[in-house]
Each structure stands twice: as structure tokens, then as C-alpha cells.
């Protein structure tokens, strides 16, 4: 907080993938959210799996994806329920064809979530998602 405005911010930090030990994104989320919390702000992380490990006081909203990288073969991830949700089918088909759809599909799922929750936050601080769905917030 600064001298001009001593009101704490309500900050949302999206992260499509937040592995707590590798890759950097999950590690970044933990360190930055801890610092924001120490400054007196309210912080919530919305993440796909793998989920980050966060300090006490930082809320985690889990926004599941198909987590296709956890399968030896993406063909094994197929379930008929994929046909019900277009975003799930898109994620699966894109993965099968060598695409990296996680940022896009996370953004679309987050946009749906955000329609119900956007007024709870003052700031959205994105680290790496860069998804079109963020614009919809």
C-alpha cells in the first residue's frame, strides 16, 4: 500500500499450469502472492493442474483442465463426456495434433468463471497465461 491509497487491493492471479517445483510458474506464484499478502492485499490464485503450493492466507481456486500431459498417451484420456463440452473436445483434439492448447482452454474456462466472480477483484495480474479469455474479464 502507498501513501496515496492505503486501501488494500483484491488481486486475482491466473495461472494455467502451476507446478510447485518445476518450470517456474508455480514458484513465481508462491513468491509473488506471499509478497502481496505481506503488503496487506487480498490475493487469490486461479490455476489449472498441477496446482501450486501457496502460503496460508492465499486462496486457491482450482480450475481443472484435462491435464493431458499426465497421461502416457493422450488417447487414454478420451472419455465420451468430452463430446458434451466443446472446450474439452478442443483441448483433446489440439493435443492429439501436436498443439499446445492449455493457455487458450484455461482462458476460456476462466472467462466463464469470471462472469460470476469479476466484481470480487480490483486487479488481475497475469504472469504467463496470455490467453484471449483474459480479455473477456
Where are these regions (language model features)?
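Short, conserved loop/helix-junction motifs that constitute active-site signature segments
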Residues: 137
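Short glycine-rich, flexible loops that bind phosphorylated cofactors or substrates
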Residues: 20, 132-133
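Short His-centered aromatic/hydrophobic patch
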Residues: 126-130
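Catalytic nucleophile loop
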Residues: 29, 131-132
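A conserved catalytic-core segment of Leloir-type glycosyltransferases
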Residues: 6-8, 46-114
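N-terminal subdomain of nucleotide-sugar transferases
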Residues: 1-66, 115-121
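Conserved protein kinase catalytic core
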Residues: 53, 133-134
